[in-house]
Amino acid sequence: MAFEIPEDSTQLSQFVTLLIFTPLGIVVTALRFVAVRRVTRKVGFEDWLAVIATIFFILTNLAGLMAISILNGRQLTQEVIESPSDYSRMRKWDIAGLFFYFAQTLSVKLSILAFYHRIFGISSTRCRICIYLLAAAQTILFIAFCIFQGFQCIPLQRYFDLSVPGECKDEGTVILGGELPNSLVDFAMVILAMIMIRPLQLSFSDKFRVTVLFGLGFVVGIIGFVKIAVTYSTSELYAFSMIALWTGVQMFTALLCCSLPMYNTFLPIVADFWNRLSHHSLGWVSRVRSSQSSSKNSRKHGPYDSDQSPGPGWDDLVAYNGTKGLTLPQAPYHGDNHALGNVSPITHPQAYSKQTTRQFDVV
């Protein structure tokens, strides 16, 4: 059979998108491991979860490519009439892709939550509990999705052969029931990241950069609602192809959100990007906050406090590699310096020649 996917624009869009994003997802995870080696950190649980997520990302896109190749430019109803066997094979790849997608969603979120735990969880009981609750919620959703998918059609054989007597649940209802709670977990993870970042002694622009970084999770959640809207399209073929397309984009964005925090010590251009973004977007806000802070400090502190450093910045946060959480003690600490990376300690001169050494080496 001739290659006729270009005859339909939606199928062609799906085909090209999956072909492009699949190798990009592999590169994203590969760069993550290069970054880990550069800072001499041992490969951790979160890194292997990212590998698992990448494998299921590839399998999901492969299933989508196989399904669209079997459809080969035809309408769904046309395929059912012309070749019921092709329709059956296409639906088998389709349902396999759904299970791969469920597994990818679980593994990538667990990887992000493991990163949260390494950085914030050990030093904060509340954060640790929230991380565990979100991990448990996503695991329960994964199990529920897998069970529910098996009952979408009764009997299940009708999913692959429309001539079999029975009934199938509406596709829109199925997508709504799956993507809505999935997106809510995405939003909850981003909100948790914002809450954990808030008490850190970072400048406003640094906090903004970290917030935007984890804000990719919002993009993942929003794509879930886009998929829900697409499902209710009047064209079954359009809905079928566009959901697969947006699923590929969604999974890639999740992988990027999972691995991007590791790139700061590997690709200086990433840090430069955040610096430029913060400079252009928040310059006026920083000036206002700086003037307000200066006026308050002049009233509260003596002349010896004017040279105090504001605390660790963006590079220090992303370069943190400790096995302990991010603890920023208020009182000076003169104990051993547990440096697990190659970044030199940041020394903050205090009044009366006291010094506080804080080491951050995140990847």
Swiss-Prot record:
Record bears the keyword Membrane: yes
Membrane topology listed for this record: Multi-pass membrane protein
Record has Transmembrane as a keyword: yes
Functional pathway: Secondary metabolite biosynthesis
Principal place of residence: membrane
Gene Ontology terms: cellular component: membrane
Glycosylation sites: N321
Coiled coil: none
Positions of region (Disordered): 293-312, 344-363
Family according to the record: Belongs to the SAT4 family.
Name of this chain's protein: Wortmanamides biosynthesis cluster protein C
Protein's organism: Talaromyces wortmannii
Gene this chain is encoded by: TwnC
